[in-house]
């Protein structure tokens, strides 16, 4: 199992209150349940199951009800959208990546990119270079993410 998969599973378990993490770097994980009420293997499999992840991706990203300080949102106004995604995922402890594909002839391809945050895939954007496609996809993802966050004053 890769580190990325383990992190996703741990943060999924944390959201469901089965484990908690320390503020150390890297975090230390502990269970929140007594020995007699520990979840079974089938409970953990249901959380990690890829099918449930696919279903959650179709929920229009409304599960991102994160609380972000207003200072961060003001700062993000003039920052590159890729930087915003990176900082957002650091604050919320989420994994993220780009999915990039190339279409067309090798001498003038069109690149398509989309942002994947914790298994939730955002809208696809195109560009003449990978960098342009990433920036365009990040802009779309930031617009959608910031429409669902809760601002803390």
Swiss-Prot record:
Residues 80-147 form the DRBM domain. Residues 22-34 have a biased composition (Polar residues). GO terms for molecular function: double-stranded RNA adenosine deaminase activity; protein serine/threonine kinase inhibitor activity; RNA binding. SMART domains: DSRM. Keywords: Host-virus interaction, Inhibition of host innate immune response by virus, Inhibition of host interferon signaling pathway by virus, Inhibition of host IRF3 by virus, Inhibition of host IRF7 by virus, Inhibition of host ISG15 by virus, Inhibition of host PKR by virus, Inhibition of host RLR pathway by virus, Interferon antiviral system evasion, Modulation of host cell apoptosis by virus, RNA-binding, Viral immunoevasion. Coiled coil: none annotated. Residues 22-44 are annotated as: Disordered. One of its GO terms (biological process) is symbiont-mediated perturbation of host apoptosis. Residues 1-33 form the Z-binding domain. The keyword RNA-binding applies. RNA-binding protein that plays a role in the inhibition of multiple cellular antiviral responses activated by double-stranded RNA (dsRNA), such as inhibition of PKR activation, necroptosis, and IFN-mediated antiviral activities. Recognizes and binds Z-RNA structures via its Z-binding domain and dsRNA via its DRBM domain: RNA-binding activity is required to escape host ZBP1-dependent necroptosis. Mechanistically, the Z-binding domain binds Z-RNAs that are produced during vaccinia virus infection, thereby competing with Z-RNA detection by host ZBP1, suppressing ZBP1-dependent necroptosis. Belongs to the orthopoxvirus OPG065 family. Interacts with host G1P2/ISG15. Interacts with host EIF2AK2/PKR. Interacts with host ZBP1. The Z-binding domain recognizes and binds Z-RNA structures. This is RNA-binding protein OPG065. It comes from Monkeypox virus.
